[in-house]
Design a protein with these regions (language model features):
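N-terminal module of bacterial RNA polymerase sigma factors
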Residues: 1-48
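Short, charged helix-capping/linker segments at alpha-helix termini
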Residues: 32-40, 51-68
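Sigma70-family region 2
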Residues: 32-33, 70-86, 105-106
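Alpha-helical structural segments
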Residues: 41-45, 70, 118
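Hydrophobic/aromatic residues within well-ordered alpha-helical segments
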Residues: 42-46, 50, 86, 94
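Hydrophobic-face residues of short alpha-helical interaction/recognition segments
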Residues: 50, 54, 90, 94-102
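Arg/Lys-rich amphipathic alpha helix in sigma70-family domain 2
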Residues: 81, 95-113
Protein backbone atom coordinates (compact mmCIF):
# COMPACT_ATOMS: atom_id res chain seq x y z
CA UNK A 1 0.00 0.00 0.00
CA UNK A 2 2.81 2.41 0.89
CA UNK A 3 4.50 1.71 -2.47
CA UNK A 4 1.28 2.59 -4.29
CA UNK A 5 0.92 5.81 -2.33
CA UNK A 6 4.53 6.79 -3.11
CA UNK A 7 4.04 5.99 -6.78
CA UNK A 8 0.91 8.13 -6.95
CA UNK A 9 2.66 11.10 -5.36
CA UNK A 10 5.63 10.68 -7.69
CA UNK A 11 3.28 10.83 -10.66
CA UNK A 12 1.52 13.89 -9.25
CA UNK A 13 4.82 15.69 -8.80
CA UNK A 14 5.68 15.07 -12.43
CA UNK A 15 2.24 16.19 -13.60
CA UNK A 16 2.22 19.41 -11.61
CA UNK A 17 3.40 22.14 -13.85
CA UNK A 18 5.48 24.88 -12.37
CA UNK A 19 6.53 27.81 -14.44
CA UNK A 20 10.25 27.70 -13.75
CA UNK A 21 10.90 29.79 -16.86
CA UNK A 22 9.68 32.81 -14.87
CA UNK A 23 12.33 32.20 -12.22
CA UNK A 24 15.53 33.60 -13.67
CA UNK A 25 18.68 35.27 -12.41
CA UNK A 26 17.07 38.71 -12.54
CA UNK A 27 14.18 37.56 -10.34
CA UNK A 28 16.58 36.19 -7.71
CA UNK A 29 18.54 39.46 -7.76
CA UNK A 30 15.31 41.40 -7.24
CA UNK A 31 14.42 39.17 -4.28
CA UNK A 32 17.89 39.73 -2.85
CA UNK A 33 17.21 43.48 -3.03
CA UNK A 34 14.00 42.96 -1.03
CA UNK A 35 11.42 43.32 -3.79
CA UNK A 36 8.23 41.71 -2.47
CA UNK A 37 6.62 41.37 -5.89
CA UNK A 38 9.56 39.27 -7.11
CA UNK A 39 9.28 37.08 -4.02
CA UNK A 40 5.58 36.64 -4.72
CA UNK A 41 6.40 35.43 -8.24
CA UNK A 42 8.84 32.85 -6.83
CA UNK A 43 6.29 31.75 -4.23
CA UNK A 44 3.48 31.37 -6.77
CA UNK A 45 5.75 29.54 -9.22
CA UNK A 46 6.85 26.90 -6.73
CA UNK A 47 4.19 26.61 -4.00
CA UNK A 48 2.03 23.79 -5.42
CA UNK A 49 5.04 21.84 -6.66
CA UNK A 50 6.86 22.06 -3.32
CA UNK A 51 3.69 21.11 -1.41
CA UNK A 52 3.42 17.97 -3.54
CA UNK A 53 7.09 17.20 -2.89
CA UNK A 54 6.69 17.67 0.87
CA UNK A 55 3.51 15.63 0.94
CA UNK A 56 5.29 12.77 -0.82
CA UNK A 57 7.63 12.59 2.20
CA UNK A 58 5.27 13.07 5.13
CA UNK A 59 1.81 12.16 3.73
CA UNK A 60 0.13 15.04 5.51
CA UNK A 61 -1.03 17.83 3.20
CA UNK A 62 -1.63 20.37 5.97
CA UNK A 63 1.83 19.89 7.49
CA UNK A 64 3.33 19.86 3.98
CA UNK A 65 1.89 23.33 3.34
CA UNK A 66 3.25 24.51 6.69
CA UNK A 67 6.72 23.22 5.80
CA UNK A 68 6.61 24.99 2.44
CA UNK A 69 5.43 28.24 4.01
CA UNK A 70 8.13 28.03 6.69
CA UNK A 71 10.72 27.45 3.96
CA UNK A 72 9.57 30.52 2.06
CA UNK A 73 9.57 32.56 5.27
CA UNK A 74 13.20 31.55 5.87
CA UNK A 75 14.05 32.49 2.29
CA UNK A 76 12.50 35.93 2.76
CA UNK A 77 14.33 36.52 6.05
CA UNK A 78 17.60 35.47 4.41
CA UNK A 79 17.09 37.51 1.25
CA UNK A 80 20.32 38.92 0.02
CA UNK A 81 21.98 35.50 0.19
CA UNK A 82 20.06 33.69 -2.57
CA UNK A 83 21.82 32.52 -5.68
CA UNK A 84 20.65 31.28 -9.05
CA UNK A 85 19.61 28.58 -9.88
CA UNK A 86 17.35 28.18 -6.87
CA UNK A 87 15.44 24.99 -7.77
CA UNK A 88 17.86 22.55 -6.09
CA UNK A 89 18.07 24.78 -3.02
CA UNK A 90 14.28 24.78 -2.65
CA UNK A 91 14.02 21.01 -3.02
CA UNK A 92 16.76 20.44 -0.42
CA UNK A 93 15.15 22.93 1.97
CA UNK A 94 11.83 21.09 1.68
CA UNK A 95 13.52 17.73 2.23
CA UNK A 96 15.24 19.08 5.34
CA UNK A 97 11.98 20.56 6.60
CA UNK A 98 10.26 17.20 6.15
CA UNK A 99 13.05 15.36 7.94
CA UNK A 100 12.85 17.81 10.84
CA UNK A 101 9.09 17.30 11.00
CA UNK A 102 9.46 13.50 11.04
CA UNK A 103 12.13 13.73 13.74
CA UNK A 104 9.86 15.90 15.87
CA UNK A 105 7.06 13.34 15.50
CA UNK A 106 9.39 10.59 16.63
CA UNK A 107 10.54 12.68 19.61
CA UNK A 108 6.96 13.46 20.64
CA UNK A 109 6.00 9.80 20.44
CA UNK A 110 8.99 8.83 22.55
CA UNK A 111 8.14 11.45 25.20
CA UNK A 112 4.51 10.30 25.31
CA UNK A 113 5.62 6.67 25.67
CA UNK A 114 7.99 7.58 28.51
CA UNK A 115 5.25 9.55 30.23
CA UNK A 116 2.83 6.61 29.94
CA UNK A 117 5.41 4.27 31.43
CA UNK A 118 6.00 6.67 34.31
CA UNK A 119 2.27 6.75 35.05
CA UNK A 120 2.02 2.97 35.20
Amino acid sequence: MMFLRNAIFAILIVLIKMDASIVDKDLIERINKGEEKAFEVLYNSYFVYLCACANSYIFNPVEAQDIVNETFAKIWYRRGELSFPIHAYLIRAIQNGCLNYLRSLHSRERIIDEYREALL
